[in-house]
C-alpha cells in the first residue's frame, strides 16, 4: 500500500515538529549548562578527529585514546562533514535530533498508509513522544541515534514483507555499536520465522560472526589493554543469574512500559522479539543505569515496538483499540518529561551561575589544553584540547578548570591537585561561584 501525498505531508510535519521540539530541548539544556554526562563531549572529540581526517582520538578517555578501542561506532564519522561546516557541541546534539526526526517520518508514513490517516497519525505522535526518545534526547547525543532510522526502515520493510530490504537496512546497524549484532541476529530469526529460512539464517549467522570479530579482534586491537573493556559488566562479580534478579521490580516495570506504550499490541507481532537482546544485556549488566527507563538505553526499542504495533494492528484490525491505550500510557509518562518542561517559563531562565561559567571558559585561550570535570566539559571541546579529571594520565594541561559546587566530587584546591597530578606550578586565576580555574606557569 502506497502512502498518499497527504500522508507524506502529515508525516513530514510531524517529523519537523519533533525536530523543533527536541532541538529546543537539546539547545536549552546545553545553554543552561545542564549536566547529563560527558558523553556528548566524547562524541564531539571523536567527530572532531574524523573531521580533521584523523583517527577518532578521544583524549577525554585518556591521552591519545582511540575510541574504537572502547565502543565500535564508526558510523559517527558520518557527522564529520557537518561538523567541518559548523564545529560545535550543538552540531552533535542536533545530529541526534535529525536522526530521530527521520525515524519519526518513517514510522508516521508506515502507520498512516497501513492503518489509515487518523489512527496512523495518532501512532506517529505516540512514537515521537515515547519515553525512549525523550530520555535519549535528555541524555545528549549517543551513537544509538543512528539505529533509530535504520530500525524504522527495516521494520517498515518487514511490515511490507519486503525481506530483501529488511536485510539491506539491518546490516548497517553493525556499524552503530557492537551490541547491535545481537539485534541484527534477532532480525534474522524473525525472517526465519516468516519463512525466509536461508536469508534469515544467513543474516543471523553473519551478525554473530561480525559481532565476534568486533569484540575479539577489532576493539581489543585499538584498546591499550588488548581487551573489550565492558565484558566484566555482564553479570558483574556475582554472575548473570544473580544480576538478572537484582531490582526485578524496576526491570519488570521497564519491560512492561516498553510494550504498554503500544497498548500491548506490539506483543502480537514477531517483530517484538527484537527487544529481547537489548533487554538481555541491560538486565544482565551489573550497571543500575541500564535497568530503568532513563538515559538513552531504550531509544533502540522505540522503533521496534512501534513497528511491531503497526504490524499487529495491520494484520489484526481488532487490535486497533490499542491506540488509545498506548496514548494514555504515553500521556501519563509525559507529566515530568523534558518536552513538558518546555512549557515552564523557568526553563528559559539563565541559571544563577551561568555568567561565572561563561567567564571561566573565556579565560581559557582557543587551542589551549585544559583538564576539567563533567561540569563544563561539553562546552570546551570545540576549541580546546580537553582532558577529563580521572583519565588525564601523563598529560600536562595548561589549564585546570573544575566546578567544585556541582556535587560531583571535584577537588576544591584546584592548584594543589594540578601540581600533584601534573607537576610544575599552577596558579588560580579565577574563582567565582564554584568555578575555579588554575593556569600552569
PLM regions with names:
Residues 90-115:
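Transmembrane-helix motifs of polytopic, lipid-linked glycan transferases
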Residues 21, 25, 32-35, 49, ...:
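Membrane-lumen/periplasm interface segments of specific transmembrane helices
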Residues 102, 106-109, 126, 145-169, ...:
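Specific aromatic-rich, kink-prone transmembrane helix
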Residues 136-144:
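Short acidic/glycine- and proline-prone juxtamembrane loop motifs at membrane-interface regions
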Residues 1-24:
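Start-transfer (signal-anchor) and selected internal transmembrane alpha helices
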Residues 42-66, 74-75:
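Extracytosolic helix-loop segments that constitute the early lumenal/periplasmic catalytic or substrate-binding loops
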Residues 273-317:
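Hydrophobic/aromatic-rich transmembrane helices and adjacent perimembrane loops
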Residues 12-16, 204-209, 314-338:
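Signature aromatic-anchored transmembrane alpha helix within multi-pass, membrane-resident enzymes
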Amino acid at each position: 500500500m502506497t502512502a498518499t501525498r497527504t500522508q507524506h505531508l502529515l508525516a513530514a510535519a510531524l517529523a519537523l515538529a519533533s525536530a523543533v521540539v527536541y532541538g529546543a530541548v537539546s539547545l536549552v539544556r546545553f545553554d543552561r549548562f545542564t549536566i547529563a554526562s560527558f558523553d556528548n563531549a566524547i562524541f564531539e572529540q571523536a567527530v572532531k578527529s574524523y573531521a580533521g581526517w584523523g583517527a577518532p582520538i578521544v583524549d577525554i578517555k585518556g591521552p591519545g585514546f582511540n575510541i574504537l578501542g572502547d565502543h565500535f561506532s564508526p558510523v559517527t564519522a558520518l557527522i564529520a562533514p557537518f561538523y567541518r561546516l559548523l564545529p560545535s557541541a550543538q552540531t552533535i546534539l542536533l545530529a541526534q535530533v535529525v536522526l530521530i526526526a527521520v525515524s519519526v517520518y518513517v514510522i508516521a508514513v508506515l502507520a498512516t498508509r497501513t492503518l489509515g490517516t487518523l489512527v496512523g497519525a495518532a501512532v506517529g505522535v505516540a512514537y515521537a513522544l515515547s519515553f525512549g526518545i525523550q530520555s535519549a534526547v535528555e541524555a545528549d547525543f549517543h551513537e544509538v541515534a543512528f539505529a533509530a532510522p535504520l530500525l524504522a526502515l527495516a521494520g517498515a520493510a518487514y511490515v511490507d514483507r519486503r525481506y530483501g530490504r529488511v536485510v539491506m537496512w539491518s546490516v548497517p546497524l553493525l556499524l552503530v555499536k557492537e551490541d547491535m549484532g545481537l539485534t541484527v541476529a534477532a532480525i534474522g530469526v524473525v525472517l526465519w520465522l516468516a519463512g525466509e529460512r536461508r536469508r534469515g539464517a544467513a543474516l543471523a549467522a553473519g551478525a554473530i560472526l561480525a559481532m565476534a570479530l568486533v569484540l575479539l579482534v577489532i576493539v581489543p586491537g585499538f584498546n591499550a589493554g588488548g581487551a573489550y573493556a565492558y565484558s566484566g559488566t555482564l553479570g558483574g562479580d556475582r554472575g548473570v543469574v544473580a544480576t538478572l534478579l537484582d531490582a526485578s521490580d524496576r526491570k519488570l516495570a521497564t519491560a512492561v512500559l516498553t510494550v504498554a506504550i503500544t497498548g500491548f499490541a506490539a506483543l502480537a507481532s514477531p517483530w517484538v522479539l527484537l527487544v529481547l537482546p537489548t533487554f538481555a544485556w541491560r538486565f544482565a549488566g551489573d550497571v543500575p543505569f541500564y535497568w530503568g527507563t532513563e538515559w538513552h538505553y531504550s531509544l533502540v526499542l522505540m522503533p521496534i515496538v512501534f513497528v511491531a504495533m503497526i504490524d499487529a494492528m495491520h494484520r489484526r484490525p481488532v487490535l486497533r483499540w490499542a491506540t488509545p491505550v498506548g496514548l494514555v500510557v504515553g500521556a501519563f509518562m509525559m507529566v515530568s518529561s523534558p518536552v513538558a518542561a518546555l512549557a515552564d517559563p523557568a526553563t528559559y531562565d539563565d541559571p544563577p551561575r551561568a555568567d561565572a561559567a561563561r567567564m571561566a571558559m573565556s579565560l581559557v585561550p582557543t587551542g589551549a589544553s585544559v583538564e576539567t570535570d563533567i561540569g563544563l566539559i561539553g562546552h570546551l571541546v570545540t576549541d580546546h584540547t580537553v582532558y577529563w579529571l580521572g583519565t588525564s594520565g601523563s598529560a600536562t594541561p595548561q589549564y585546570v578548570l573544575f566546578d567544585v559546587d556541582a556535587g560531583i566530587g571535584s577537588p576544591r584546591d584546584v592548584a594543589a591537585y594540578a601540581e600533584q597530578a601534573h607537576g610544575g606550578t599552577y596558579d588560580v586565576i579565577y574563582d567565582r561561584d564554584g568555578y575555579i580555574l588554575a593556569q600552569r606557569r
